[in-house]
């Protein structure tokens, strides 16, 4: 049965398949307890890793874990989009079942159900720990799992099943050199503060997400985080790009992704900043489905990126955003204008100050003008 499952998974497009025991993950449980303040947010929503540390809390009859891995860096990513959107999101990993990755998962789940196999997937199982237990990868100091031939650009899906598939029970290990701290040095916010330790609330990616999708994600991004977000508007790859273990993968000559080449023509910071509902529904939502449930959060992130660019050419676009009906968009446009500075930015802020009735936006304008 295990071989039949493996062959089917490979046939429908997964790149690695492994099996692991369904025993609890005591090291993860201990880490979550030790760092409860950093990880309080994972006790809600789809993640609930505090429950998922024991797969049998998800499927009481669980006997094995199936771990599926897909290499999401098989095609190149346009330079216009890298540095703005994380590669995992550019690869459309988390789209619904009517798109390729979601369809692949549905096919696999249906395959198991047709054979009378019960499965559990929610709350989310600890994918990286499961992949390590199955012998499919090793940990990096940036907390990612590294898979031979893929680096850390590996999409992992774990399912608990009620059949014994002869799974592995390997210890989680790392193959990073003891003296390497490239990922830690590359993290501008200090989210990666020591090897294998991350405070997610300081992570750029975490702060670009939309509240509601992820518990405790702030609507208002702290000022000192904004300044360090650079051009990132959704996700962040800095710790992966800096890693020597990813160097070979990042330097590979890969075929282009035709879909992304088309999206790169329209998904620009200025287009996102001042997008209307039609642009959001036709250009953004099919591309970033489910990641950003309201356009104002992506407009917020685009404003931050434009402010961090320091480019005077962004000032007219940000001045226009000061007229947006959404308070959040106006507030972050004001912050961005203050970040860029100059006479034109100041004139736009002063013009809006006399007409603004939101205390939050006025606060941002006053700070920007000082």
Language model: regions and residue ranges:
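Long C-terminal interaction/binding lobes of large macromolecular proteins
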Residues: 1-5, 15-17, 323, 347, ...
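Auxiliary alpha/beta "docking" domains used to position bulky ligands
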Residues: 1-175, 359
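Iron-sulfur cluster-binding cysteine motifs and their immediate structural context
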Residues: 14, 182-205, 228-257
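Structural detector for internal amphipathic alpha-helices that build alpha-solenoid repeat scaffolds
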Residues: 299-311, 320, 330-342, 362-370
């Amino acid at each position: 049965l295990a071989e039949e499952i493996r062959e089917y998974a490979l046939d429908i497009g997964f790149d690695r398949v492994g099996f692991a025991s369904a025993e609890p993950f005591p090291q993860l449980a201990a880490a979550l307890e030790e760092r409860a303040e950093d990880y309080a947010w994972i006790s809600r929503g789809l993640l609930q890793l505090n429950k998922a540390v024991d797969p049998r809390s998800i499927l009481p009859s669980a006997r094995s874990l199936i771990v599926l891995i897909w290499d999401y860096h098989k095609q190149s990513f346009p330079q216009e989009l890298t540095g703005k959107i994380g590669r995992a999101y550019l690869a459309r990993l988390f789209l619904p079942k009517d798109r390729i990755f979601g369809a692949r998962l549905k096919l696999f789940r249906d395959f198991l159900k047709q054979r009378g196999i019960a499965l559990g997937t929610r709350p989310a199982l600890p994918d990286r720990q499961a992949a390590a237990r199955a012998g499919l990868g090793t940990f990096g100091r940036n907390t990612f799992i590294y898979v031979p031939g893929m680096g850390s650009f590996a999409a992992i899906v774990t399912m608990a099943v009620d059949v014994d598939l002869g799974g592995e029970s390997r210890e989680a290990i790392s193959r990073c050199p003891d003296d390497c701290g490239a990922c830690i040095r590359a993290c501008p916010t200090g989210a990666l503060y020591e090897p294998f330790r991350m405070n997610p609330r300081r992570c750029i990616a975490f702060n670009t997400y939309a509240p509601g999708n992820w518990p405790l994600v702030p609507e208002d991004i702290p000022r000192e985080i904004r300044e360090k977000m650079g051009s990132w508007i959704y996700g962040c790859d800095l710790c992966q790009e800096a890693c020597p273990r990813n160097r070979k993968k990042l330097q590979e000559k890969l075929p282009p992704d035709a879909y992304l080449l088309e999206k790169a023509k329209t998904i620009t910071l200025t287009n996102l900043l001042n997008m209307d509902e039609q642009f959001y529904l036709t250009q953004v939502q099919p591309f970033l489905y489910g990641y950003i449930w309201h356009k104002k959060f992506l407009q917020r992130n685009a404003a931050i990126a434009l402010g961090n660019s320091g480019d005077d050419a962004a000032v007219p676009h940000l001045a226009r955003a000061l007229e947006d009906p959404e308070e959040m968009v106006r507030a972050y446009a004001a912050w961005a204008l203050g970040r860029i500075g100059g006479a034109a930015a100041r004139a736009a802020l002063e013009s809006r100050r006399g007409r603004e009735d939101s205390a939050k936006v006025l606060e941002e304008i006053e700070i920007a003008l000082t």
